[in-house]
Amino acid sequence: MKKNTVALLALMLAFVMLFAVGCDTLPEDVDELVVYNWADYIYDYEDDFKEYYKNLTGRDIKVTYVTFDTNETMLTKILNGDSIVDVMCPSEYAIQKLLENGLLRELNYFGTAEEYIDTNSLNGYVHNSENIDSRFIEKIDEVFGSVQITDGDGTKTVRMADYFVPYMYGTLGVLYNKVYFEELGIYDRETLNNANWGLLFNDDGNGNLLSDGLTGRIYMKDSIRDSYAATVFYLLESGKLDGLTVQDTSSPNYGKPYTELTMGQMINTVDDQLIDLCADVLKKQKEQLYGYEVDFGKNELIQGIAYVDLAWSGDALYAVEESWDDDYIDPMLEYEEGESGGYTLGYYVPHDSGNIWFDGWVIPTTCPDEHLQAAKIFINFLNELYVSANNMMEIGYTSAVSAEKVRNDPECREILAQGYLVYGEDWEITDEDGNVLSQEDCDYASWEEFAEYFFDYVDPIDDSNWRYPFEIVPDNEYGREINQLGVMKDFGANNNKVSTMWEDVRSTGITAWALLGWTALALAVVVGVIALVLWLKRRKMMYVVVKKSSTEQHK
């Protein structure tokens, strides 16, 4: 209750700040910028940006930083015209929705520097568009291509990549506890890769129960889009869509078998038939669930309260790194005699089908002309290599900036080395007290050892690179390819149908384990009340006895 109150107050404060910005009168030599972003989704950037801005413009800048908790919160404020924002960071489908409503300024960031910004008014401006991994833009063009928008000039078709700049990206997968999977006898390559998305449904991939021990130990995301995507993939790989065709008459894939769709097409199909199938599976899944969560699932997995959770790769990486146990011995790894230590959590990316998502920076049409240059400078600043390294180290997600450029940049190496305690002859690693650490005291004995973990990691279970999903292991056993990762679009006219389905699923009964939890809580409350009544009754009797005794003494 207290947490909800604090969250509500935070949202109210953010709402007030969005209205209040621009009310203060600033000195003539100070510019202003209003940034709207997810909470905890950037490093402590402000001093670096102010210096960067001053070097380019010769002017100071005041930054107002406001956060949102969901894309829907952000969309509501922008679509209703309830906010004053200069630059913001929505997810892919929200960018599409804003663009279709004519609410985004064209950027042309991937053209020339002169097309993007007035370079003549800046001192030594370096355009950082080439720092972005080109495969990212290719994927966006492949999925979204041209978007039809309606603005003040009427209806026209535009390229989505001209209206945003990628920021962070990742995958959707399954976070799991290795220790308990090992106890249940299901921690091995064959078992997990047969189950795939079935891990979330306690299905071994053949329609059988994966393990009795998983019942009541599975978390599902309280997120319409992510849960829908995972369920669609499960339906596809489990054969439940065999022989069925797309029923949406407005879809270009109408009448086409689901099994012949690309992952991009599959993940964006929302016809009545598929929605009903998802609803049936999700309702049945509740028999296996511990519950639904958004932010706290990773803690329950580390503690062993739950064993499985639908997770975003950035959260998963953070959770995995938090799960290190010096005494744990991972049966999938090789150890020298007497050695131990490993991560008790793992992140599994199903190999047949999956979702790759991204967030990007946009400038809404509400951005005043006098703030436009500052907004564009801010976006370019975020694509500085050292900024990218700081962001990845701070928040755990993968930057759209090229991994190779970050890897080979001396400044980035030193930033990552300090953050991850990597020994190197070109820098000194210090602890919190400023003491220089020896090679033995560092977590990584060399940059090469760290780079193998950070940039080149290959999961021993699913052959995937968690941090960089564009990097595909050539000889991976299960034939994983990047085209098996689809990007979700806005559901458009079908959004209400999916939302209604999800609300129906969430409100249909409660999970058996949640019922047990509430029953236990109710019993605890009843026992507590009875104990309190008995204690008060006993206290009253003691009071009467004491009072009577005292009265007798005064007689």
Predicted feature locations:
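C-terminal motif of bacterial Sec signal peptides marking the signal peptidase cleavage site
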Residues: F19-G22
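Short helices/loops that flank or line small-molecule/ion binding pockets
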Residues: E72-V85, Q96-N101, L199, D204, ...
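Ligand-binding pocket segment of bilobal, Venus flytrap-like solute-binding proteins
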Residues: M220, S227-G346
